[in-house]
Amino acid sequence: MASRIAKDVTELIGNTPLVYLNNVAEGCVGRVAAKLEMMEPCSSVKDRIGFSMISDAEKKGLIKPGESVLIEPTSGNTGVGLAFTAAAKGYKLIITMPASMSTERRIILLAFGVELVLTDPAKGMKGAIAKAEEILAKTPNGYMLQQFENPANPKIHYETTGPEIWKGTGGKIDGFVSGIGTGGTITGAGKYLKEQNANVKLYGVEPVESAILSGGKPGPHKIQGIGAGFIPSVLNVDLIDEVVQVSSDESIDMARQLALKEGLLVGISSGAAAAAAIKLAQRPENAGKLFVAIFPSFGERYLSTVLFDATRKEAEAMTFEA
């Protein structure tokens, strides 16, 4: 009997399950399934690209464990994806991150031994990128992975996420719904799905408050991980059939409903993807169609955010019963 023990934690990445949404999708004429990326080793879809970008740079001879210092600007989850891979492979990692991101993300990054530099939240991801470039310029053997520009980002989704969805749905997928942060997921997985069936539609999700892809202006919003305020070079906008806008409030409410009605504790961007997919599945022309939405991350990473404000206050105010 062959051993099924993984060589290290990076071998556990991928092959996440798909599950139908039932109660929150009541009244829909189409069906909605979620790809549960919270089941990754470090609980987010970014585990895939963290591993992919480091491995790709290693194969190209651009970095070496124990010598190279990896640097990356991130809103949090990519940092975690890079952090556990860097720890397993023996790299020092410096992360720049807007100070508005959740406390959990800071703690997790520090737990993995990351050197964390917080940046002005008013400057968003652009501020984090500028700080990372400044650090890179003065760091010997520094190497920036650049998730917004690195082809290894969409490549891993083309090689793994897309095929997993195609196989998991038995090729019966009609629409793929993905929030757009770097654009790597929708570009890579979407390209693969369209190659299998040109009729598969790709739906990008962005915040109403920062609807860049729809021709709007960048603005502050509460959906951590999507709506970066610019169009990343990794994103192939030509692949996208439609951009669906959802508000921060809609996304937060849906994330809460997913916990209460589906037993799925997810982050705010999962709420955004679900809200968008349900809107699509409610359209009469989509009767009988199957939409797969990416749920990027686990809700436990958002306990200190607006998502769990009321719950946290209730929990903190509780006293024991005699």
Curated annotation (Swiss-Prot):
Positions carrying Phosphoserine are: S178
Q: How is its activity regulated?
A: Interaction with the sulfate transporter SULTR1;2 enhances its catalytic activity.
Query: Mind listing the GO molecular function terms for this protein?
Result: cysteine synthase activity; mRNA binding
- What pathway does this protein act in? Amino-acid biosynthesis; L-cysteine biosynthesis; L-cysteine from L-serine: step 2/2
Q: Give me the reactions it catalyses.
A: O-acetyl-L-serine + hydrogen sulfide = L-cysteine + acetate
GO CC terms of this entry: apoplast; chloroplast; chloroplast stroma; cytosol; nucleus; peroxisome; plant-type vacuole; plasma membrane
Q: Which CDD domains match?
A: CBS_like (cd01561)
The PTM N-acetylalanine maps to A2
Q: Name one Pfam family in it.
A: PALP
Subcellular location field: Cytoplasm
Consequence the record notes for mutating T182 to A/S: Slight reduction of cysteine synthase activity
Effect annotated for changing H157 to Q/N: Slight reduction of cysteine synthase activity
Region SAT1 binding, annotated ranges? 217-222
N6-(pyridoxal phosphate)lysine PTM positions read K46
Please give the cofactor(s) recorded in the UniProt entry for this protein. pyridoxal 5'-phosphate
Sequence positions that bind pyridoxal 5'-phosphate: N77, G181, T182, G183, G184, T185, S269
* Record keywords, A-Z: Acetylation, Amino-acid biosynthesis, Cysteine biosynthesis, Cytoplasm, Phosphoprotein, Pyridoxal phosphate, Transferase
A GO BP annotation: cysteine biosynthetic process from serine
Q: Which residue stretches belong to region SUTR1?
A: 144-287
Query: What EC designation does it have?
Result: 2.5.1.47
Q: How does it assemble?
A: Homodimer. Interacts with SAT1. Component of the cysteine synthase complex (CSC) composed of two OAS-TL dimers and one SAT hexamer. Interacts with SULTR1;2.
- Tell me the function of this protein: Acts as a major cysteine synthase, probably involved in maintaining organic sulfur level.
Q: Say which family it is in.
A: Belongs to the cysteine synthase/cystathionine beta-synthase family.
Xref: NCBIfam families = cysK, cysKM
The identity of this protein, by name, is Cysteine synthase 1
Q: Write the lineage as a comma-separated list.
A: Eukaryota, Viridiplantae, Streptophyta, Embryophyta, Tracheophyta
